[in-house]
Amino acid sequence: MFRFKFLKKPKFYVWAGFVLFLLVAAPIAIDFSFEELYLHTERFQNHRSARPATVAVVPGASVYKNEPSPVLKDRLDCALELYHQGKVRKILLSGDNGSIYYNEVKPMLLYILKNEVNERDIFVDHAGFRTLDTLVRAKEIFQVKDLIFVSQRVYQPRAAFLANKIGLKFQAFEADRRIYTSGPFSRIREFFARTLAWVDMNLFKTNPKYLGDPFPIEGSGIKTWKGSVL
């Protein structure tokens, strides 16, 4: 009969304990390092504290019955605040449109269009599946050099880390406008997402799912709407 003889060796338990320690300690260390980086990031909850930037980048979030969820609505409202107060000249809406059954960017675009934004100033990225995709594509496809990232506080440290890694000038607009029912779950999910982001950038050098030809943010964004309302 086959026996697991290695289980009787003390060295096995030493190595197993060491591996287990790394699996627990590494994500905690990464989480703290992201928070430390964020302490040195320009961040605010009001447009008055923002420095002018080229574009407000709004990552997608859940939509319900083709309407933005509270989390997403607050992000969009903050982006509109930045635009109408002259802090940004463009708005880039980046979300998941990878299925005919789910489309984040169409409700985002329709919401922005209802709020007196020049159509030429609105850009849509249909392949913003993750924050990594959103930021790398903003730089590589839309030729963005400086941005204000509009999202809730819990997600901002990861975005700041990614932006720092790829060389984007980054400001964080914390779009928390209420207490969200998803709050505790979001923090747990974000804990692991930060570890994945660290691994993506430092070990695997992960690229976005899709790249493509440049479409500079300085022009008109109307052609990027295809698949949303066109």
Where are the regions that the model predicts?
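Electropositive, surface-exposed helix/loop patches at the edges of structured domains
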Residues: 17, 129-135, 155-162, 205-230
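Low-complexity, compositionally biased segments
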Residues: 77-80, 136, 167, 193, ...
